[in-house]
């Protein structure tokens, strides 16, 4: 298994409960693929560097993951489908720092 860091930006119109449920959906995808989510960190509602789909702000999240590449493929596929996610980036890292 490999370590990954994923930053997810959601639409600013989402309520706190909607954002939490969306993050829970994403973490459950990793769990069903026999992966492990080490941490989920909310960076809050922040300004975007430039407009994305007419949005000036977004809810930012950092998720640290330990899983197989096939799990990341499904994880990213689900994020592409979801209209509440306006941008994401997942990178492979050597180790997860605490």
List where the protein language model places each region.
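Structured, basic alpha/beta domains of bacterial-type, RNA-associated proteins
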Residues: 2-98
